[in-house]
UniProtKB/Swiss-Prot annotation:
The gene is glis2. The C2H2-type zinc finger 1 has a major repressor function. Residues 49-101, 423-450 are annotated as: Disordered. Keywords: Activator, Cytoplasm, Developmental protein, Differentiation, DNA-binding, Metal-binding, Neurogenesis, Nucleus, Repeat, Repressor, Transcription, Transcription regulation, Zinc, Zinc-finger. Can act either as a transcription repressor or as a transcription activator, depending on the cell context. May be involved in neuron differentiation. Residues 138-161 are annotated as: Transcription repression. It holds the Pfam family zf-C2H2_15. One of its GO terms (molecular function) is zinc ion binding. GO terms for cellular component: cytoplasm; nuclear speck; nucleus. SUPFAM superfamilies: beta-beta-alpha zinc fingers. The keyword Repressor applies. This is Zinc finger protein GLIS2. It comes from Xenopus laevis (African clawed frog).
């Protein structure tokens, strides 16, 4: 029977028609072969080029498998290669392996890099508009095990994984009908319990059949509700309604707080916004020393991810067991502007210079310094005068920061120690290593003694355990102005 694209000539025999058709096919095949027949060569530096078979190689090229050099030297199309790494960067190519033959991804075991890396194949893309093509024999199909895994995944989705069922289905609708008719309906007396293998509910039932049907869609991947605008499908009708508001711009949920006119397309977003108007922030960071609190858990997760405040399960147990004792509320210690004593671990900045700090030290109360003069208070205290978790604290001067670390680089605040008595607040240079002294009430204290406490320019208060500063590598602390009640807190 003749094809419709050929003229019907009754005077020609079938054999002549077949011979003419084969001749035209041979001519077309030869023309295409001459236009696309190229040779792959690998440069010494690992770069692969495609050049017509009649070309001569430029310097630095070698031929594979003893091929003879061609005769002429037309222009060369250079296709740079790089061995495939674990993750392909977006800058490698913007082409997709699904493109036409002119843009097809090549992954051929014959394209190998010479030397020790002969086992790693190269991948490259043919440029757009180049007109170059490669024979189909050079293209690799996915490995057999990958094809089997994909087929198994698709087939597994159409298997009823209800307990002791394992029936196979060709269509998704058949699987859905089977589950609804044979498994959901008989579960009415049992409380609509899901017995799908691996279900996270672990046998906990539903009080209504429609809830059970919605839950089953998480196992069967059924999405019966489709958006008429963008054709995106959803498993629940409520989700489709919320999605449609992104097309219509409707925002029916308004903030109930007086004076706030913000509106939202769904109630959950409005609920998150509403909590920002109230003081209650129940979600807090559990990293010791971090006092960040948030109104919703998503903001807390962003904070933990941004600052690396991850607490392991063992650390959480330690923090629960060893809670710091609370100070007794007395009338004498009325602190309205409490400030924490920040004792960070300087190992991240200063290398080996680290201060070991207990996880649960008790509050450090410097209320005994509340008098008209810090010097008189220090003179009346024994040596060592303060303790932290049973260890004596060294309040003597010490060389803490070297000249190499600038105050601007560390970002330390101004140093000032303020008691509840009458003390002058003077701006001090930011914390660096050096000598120490302090000004209070306009009287100069002699540096280098217990009375001359630690707050000269370029001085830092040393609270490392031990009487002598030589016992441990000293850490560094910063006391912001404005308080006398100081609570130790480890800072990441």
């Amino acid at each position: 029977m003749h094809s419709l694209d050929e003229p019907l000539d009754l005077k020609l025999s079938i054999s002549k028609l077949r011979a003419a058709r084969e001749k035209r096919e041979r001519i077309g095949a030869n023309a295409r072969k001459r236009s696309v027949h190229h040779e792959l060569m690998i440069r010494d530096d690992g770069t692969t080029v495609i050049t017509p078979i009649c070309s001569s190689p430029p310097p630095g090229f070698r031929y594979r498998d003893g091929d003879s050099p061609p005769f002429s030297s037309p222009p060369i199309v250079d296709l740079s290669l790089s061995p495939p790494s674990g993750t392909d960067s977006p800058s490698r190519s913007s082409l997709s392996p699904d493109r036409a033959a002119g843009d097809t991804l090549i992954d051929n075991p014959l394209l190998r890099c010479g030397g020790d890396s002969a086992s790693s194949p190269f991948q490259f893309f043919l440029p757009l508009g180049s007109g170059l093509q490669l024979p189909p024999s050079m293209f690799m199909s996915p490995p057999k095990e990958n094809r089997l895994s994909l087929e198994f995944t698709e087939q597994k989705q159409l298997v009823c994984q209800w307990a002791k069922c394992n029936r196979l289905f060709e269509l998704l609708q058949e699987l859905v009908d089977h589950v609804n008719d044979f498994h959901v309906k008989p579960e009415k007396d049992a409380g609509y319990c899901c017995h799908w293998e691996g279900c996270a509910r672990r046998g906990r039932g539903f009080n209504a059949r429609y809830k059970m049907l919605i839950h089953i869609r998480t196992h069967t991947n059924e999405r019966p509700h489709c958006c008429p605008t963008c054709h995106k499908s959803f498993s629940r009708l409520e989700n489709l309604k919320i999605h449609n508001r992104s097309h219509t711009g409707e925002k029916p949920y308004m903030c109930p707080y007086e004076g706030c006119n913000k509106r939202y397309s769904n109630s959950s977003d409005r609920f998150k916004h509403t909590r920002t108007h109230y003081v209650d922030k129940p979600y807090y960071c559990k990293m010791p020393g971090c006092q960040k609190r948030y109104t919703d858990p998503s903001s807390l997760r962003k904070h933990i991810k941004a600052h690396g405040h991850f607490i392991s399960h063992q650390q959480r147990q330690l923090l629960k067991i060893h809670q710091p004792p609370k100070l007794p509320a007395t009338g004498d210690s009325n602190y309205t502007n409490g400030t924490q004593l920040i004792i960070p671990n300087p190992a991240a900045i200063f290398g080996s210079q680290s201060l070991p700090i207990p996880l649960t030290p008790g509050p450090l109360d410097l209320s005994s310094l509340a008098c008209s003069s810090v010097a008189s208070a220090l003179a009346g205290l024994p040596n060592p005068m303060l303790t932290l978790a049973g260890s004596p604290l060294n309040l003597a001067k010490g060389s803490l920061l070297s000249q190499a670390y600038s105050a601007a680089g560390l970002g330390l605040p101004l140093i000032s120690l303020v008691t509840s008595g009458k003390v002058e607040n003077e701006k001090r240079p930011k914390g660096q290593r050096g000598d120490s002294s302090e000004r209070t009430d306009g009287s100069k204290l002699r540096p280098g003694s217990i009375e001359g406490l630690s707050l000269l320019p370029r001085g830092v208060l040393d609270l490392s355990p031990g009487v002598g500063s030589e016992s441990l590598l000293p850490g560094w602390v910063v006391i912001p102005p404005g308080s006398v009640l100081l609570k130790p807190a480890v800072v990441n």
